[in-house]
Amino acid sequence: MSEPLLEVRGLSSGYGESRVLDDISFSMGVEAVGIIGRNGMGKTTLCDTLMGLVRATSGEVLLHGQRIEGRTPEKVARSGISYVPQGRRLFASLSVDEHLRMLAKGTRGKRWTPDAVYELFPRLAQRRSSGGADLSGGEQQMLAVGRTLLLNGSLVLMDEPSEGLAPTIVDVLVEAVHRLVAEGTAVLVVEQKLLAATAMAERQLVMVSGRIQAETTATQLRADPELQRRYLGVGSAVETGEQPTAAPAKGRHA
């Protein structure tokens, strides 16, 4: 059996005296894996802990068999994890092309270059001279993903990539995730929208109150209203074609 690309063992973390993550364990290879859960269940804290932005209080994180918990965010990124956080975090005055060229140094001969990003997202190529503030929400998210790809990491971590986006733009991101995996890049997707999460990844880890409560498949999750209600606080809106979103929980961290 081959070694997992990412392995998380008994990971806990929090803020001050408040524990948010509680004994998280999972592993993944070169695949797309979804972390789905209601708002406030600790999903963003998991992302930030994996990236070294929040200190782990216990447990281990291994990437390619090497422990990376305790490293700075810069060292985690150099180890091979690329992060697309919530909020997109673009520069309003820089053009699309300037955003990409800023990170293009050293990409010659690697899989992801600015031209490869434009090929993945043709809409960005059409808007390459537009400033970050002039882009639509969907275009900003494409740019945020494309900019991250230029780091040429072995694992891309996406936090709520479908947030605020029209279904047609979500479809573009779904296609991008599938292509990344097909070309050898692992993707860990954190989502609370059921349809987006299950379209991006067949394997789903359900997060409740800072713990991985269940592992299931996208197929099973879409087809099981009881599972949706129990873990996500939603009904069977998926049957009507609506975009079910996990109900928020009070007093918890995202």
What label would you give each PLM region?
Residues 156-160:
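Catalytic Walker B motif of ABC-type/P-loop ATPase nucleotide-binding domains
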Residues 55, 67-88, 114, 126-130, ...:
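ABC ATPase NBD coupling module
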